[in-house]
Amino acid sequence: MSITDLSPTLGILRSLYPHVQVLVDFADDIVFREGHKATLIEESDTSHFKSFVRGIFVCFHKELQQVPSCNQICTLPELLAFVLNSVKRKRKRNVLAHGYNFQSLAQEERDADQFKLQGDVTQSAAYVHGSDLWRKVSMRLGTDITRYLFESCSVFVAVPPSCLFQVCGIPIYDCFSLATASLGFSLQSRGCRERCLGVNSMKRRAFNVKRYLRKRKTETDQKDEARVCSGKRRRVMEEDKVSCETMQDGESGKTTLVQKQPGSKKRSEMEATLLPLEGGPSWRSGTFPPLPPSQSFMRTLGFLYGGRGMRSFLLNRKKKTAEGFRKIQGRDLIRIVFFEGVLYLNGLERKPKKLPRRFFNMVPLFSQLLRQHRRCPYSRLLQKTCPLVGIKDAGQAELSSFLPQHCGSHRVYLFVRECLLAVIPQELWGSEHNRLLYFARVRFFLRSGKFERLSVAELMWKIKVNNCDWLKISKTGRVPPSELSYRTQILGQFLAWLLDGFVVGLVRACFYATESMGQKNAIRFYRQEVWAKLQDLAFRSHISKGQMVELTPDQVAALPKSTIISRLRFIPKTDGMRPITRVIGADAKTRLYQSHVRDLLDMLRACVCSTPSLLGSTVWGMTDIHKVLSSIAPAQKEKPQPLYFVKMDVSGAYESLPHNKLIEVINQVLTPVLNEVFTIRRFAKIWADSHEGLKKAFIRQADFLEANMGSINMKQFLTSLQKKGKLHHSVLVEQIFSSDLEGKDALQFFTQILKGSVIQFGKKTYRQCQGVPQGSAVSSVLCCLCYGHMENVLFKDIINKKSCLMRLVDDFLLITPNLHDAQTFLKILLAGVPQYGLVVNPQKVVVNFEDYGSTDSCPGLRVLPLRCLFPWCGLLLDTHTLDIYKDYSSYADLSLRYSLTLGSCHSAGHQMKRKLMGILRLKCHALFLDLKTNSLEAIYKNIYKLLLLHALRFHVCAQSLPFGQSVAKNPAYFLLMIWDMVEYTNYLIRLSNNGLISGSTSQTGSVQYEAVELLFCLSFLLVLSKHRRLYKDLLLHLHKRKRRLEQCLGDLRLARVRQAANPRNPLDFLAIKT
């Protein structure tokens, strides 16, 4: 094994751990208390053992503090059992315990013998338990060191030629977040960076200032922490045995975990555990003292699916006491916000029972808040700001008339603002400045997308703490930094509760907030009355299709205890409501059911991988579409002929699948493997991307046991993946491995969920007698298997080498040179296929030929010219050349702000860069950039439009930066970001063409580097010049670079670039909003 093969993988470990050593070097540094050094390798050892210990890497955060003994106190199996039982009992994160579950024993029996395994061992524990090599390592290092390795270190085993897998320790994927994972990786070559015209000198000048500020901030944070955790407030911190902080070095980008070890704790209790890197506000999470402001977030997901009325509003809830329930008082609210959290209402009380003097002085103010809340006319304010229009006289109005009646985020903000003015006493704001700033944050929060969040640090930005006299114990005298820090923490807790508890709770009480199918991630706010009418009309339409049968109370009572009841909800579409059925719950029964659903999905995928014909013409995405079109496009370009296109969309595909046909199809899939044993492995993969930094992915994989007998343990599995070329320079962490599932188990569970599908809507319960739930993870595969079976029966004569049929779940596309085949396909599907529940939506049928019989029978059929750009699933296909373009008409009237979730994080600039790089990787797909399937003109046009949309995304991200950050404050960084994206785009274009395009900066190849760079300049100049004041410095550099590129490009290539960029602002981009 060459160390050079492992060097990139070891670089990942060194970027995350301060100490990384080979086990041999780790052992050489140990001196036992008996006076001699540890000897891991002896001359008589076999080469196999020497190779084994040299392939083990030990990573740790802090060196061993106590002097260990060399004594062998217990055997390796006993020590392993002790560690596993301890980890499970203390609920610590350790890879060694993955797959180890306690048996159903009483607590007394579990604690009786800690040296005995209380369950089956699999995965890492089984690998160590059954290894003679690990037993020899344990004997030579002694029990103390072996236990230290298992409990406090992260140990990785090398698998030649270039990968590692983790054996024990906190999972490596928990040691970094994607928000900061891109640090420490250079994206630009030196030559490219020198083109930034003085950018590096600007960065150097900024670095010294940042280093000084970072040092000051670290010192202040340490003082603040000491003050905040002093006295009575230290009580909760002492409950945690060890806490860890994440500290980042801005220059190297390494993450160091620093252990804090209370002196009163024993060594055995000082194992490293990770506190949450982020979480919710303390009043909701119950974490006191609260997390640092930059790690505490309010999420817009909290708005969703409310509409339960004011009775559920926090300030209207009652406190549980020994005498019963009573209304909350001022001191109760103080305890909820600053001490106990929402669990206080359920009777939870912590010390101190008597409020400290500072908080006791706040009681009158919070009592006034509650009095003003009880007098506040919420209904009148709601009707004033978000009035209902014609809802009482609607009667049996159409569903489409209610869909547009949602309240804009600005109207909701006006309502919330009126309520805050009426309820919150002026003294709590401190000043008009603070109140106006807070209102601005509330307005921003209400306008945010579904997955966005706001940190307490951002909420507190520019708030003047000293204006709030209610925070002070003494109104006069000197204010030390620690006191100011504590006041800031208290104000942060209050403002976080005011947003997450009061504002979010008020919105949930008065509105039903939901996503919509048309606006990606945008949140719609419906008044309760409107949503109730919408939901009622949608449900009537849904149940009229005969897909569900209502159960009587007696039938509901007779349901087996194992029955899982799903919930039905609706999501607004442009012209209707989409039913979504989901299983919601965190109890053991629900978790087991969801686990079985995932297992069924994995086993069906394994069957499909072994017999792809089961899926018929199914394509799962752009990669599959590219593979299909690559088989016919070259021949069409070489010898053009008329092609006939048919696009069909099934109406209600999931809900219309007949159960008898589904059972028949799945029986045919699983019957050949009824007695086959499946292995299901879930693992995490961590790797370093040269352009996007550290990345992680979580993968589930199912295989047949018989075909993978040589890949049972992780080392064998990793070796197999590398031999197949599927993996290199990666770290794997096994999470779950099971090998006890058979095909008959999957068939039995499928039959059970199909015949026993019970759905609850409101107070009524129904049994689904047709179709599959649209929200289930397995529904898409079931739908594709059913339609694949239909295609194999009905269309086997139509599909041949010259024709191709593709189907993305329920969207069909036929491309054929035979007009008769196209007409036959059209007639069959227009007539419907009742045995498969297939009914075509006539409004979504598109063809590029005249068929008078079909046109008469289907008046909504859309006929395009023989030669045109044919739309299908977000693509435009040239019917003559088979060139493929992206269809940007779907972005019309949509705001790009909702298609991106930048988030509030420590390094917003790095997060922005990671987001934009990730989007480039997804959008620069070979489907649009492959010269074998697309003409050069089409590729240039695709690149320009892709980059134009990317420039719009860049602008949206730049406007979303927190803390008043802007491009104007650091143009050097954002200019480098643009050049990094140029290089990455060029790399992706080369990757899509397997070397057909030269990646050098010389003028060779069909699409050269300078051409891509010029397209970047043109697209970014077009977008950013509309906001000249914001991007003045960037525009100057982009104009200079554009002129230089136009001079160095030849006439033909420059003409090709200008052809792609004409018109500069395409028609389909005019309706895109930012």
Swiss-Prot record:
Enzyme class at the top of the EC tree: transferase
Region of interest called Interaction with RNA template, as start-end residue ranges on this chain: 355-360, 461-486
List GO molecular-function terms, semicolon-separated.
Answer: metal ion binding; telomerase activity; telomerase RNA binding; telomeric DNA binding
Which residues does the annotated region (Disordered) include? Answer: 240-265
Major localization class: nucleus
- Name the consequence of E515A: Reduced RNA template binding and strongly impaired telomerase activity
Motif TFLY: where in chain: 300-305
For the Reverse transcriptase domain, which residue ranges apply?
552-877
Under the cellular component aspect of Gene Ontology, which terms does the record hold? Answer: chromosome, telomeric region; telomerase catalytic core complex
- GO BP terms: DNA strand elongation; telomere maintenance via telomerase
| Source taxon at top rank | Eukaryota
For binding Mg(2+), which residues are annotated in this chain's numbering? D649, D810, D811
Which tissues carry this protein? Answer: Detected at highest levels in gill, ovary and testis, and at lower levels in brain, eye, heart, skin, spleen and stomach.
Q: Which InterPro entries match?
A: DNA/RNA_pol_sf, RT_dom, Telomerase_RBD, Telomerase_RT, TERT_C
Arranged from A to Z, the UniProt key words for this protein are: Chromosome, Magnesium, Metal-binding, Nucleotidyltransferase, Nucleus, Ribonucleoprotein, RNA-binding, RNA-directed DNA polymerase, Telomere, Transferase
The protein's annotated catalytic reaction(s) are: DNA(n) + a 2'-deoxyribonucleoside 5'-triphosphate = DNA(n+1) + diphosphate
Q: Which cysteines are joined by disulfide bonds?
A: none
| Quaternary data | Catalytic subunit of the telomerase holoenzyme complex composed minimally of TERT and the telomerase RNA template component (TERC).
Which family does the entry's similarity section mention?
A: Belongs to the reverse transcriptase family. Telomerase subfamily.
- Per its UniProt record, what PANTHER family does this chain match? TELOMERASE REVERSE TRANSCRIPTASE
The protein, known as: Telomerase reverse transcriptase
The protein's organism comes out as Takifugu rubripes
Q: What is the lineage of its organism?
A: Eukaryota, Metazoa, Chordata, Craniata, Vertebrata
- Tell me the gene name: tert
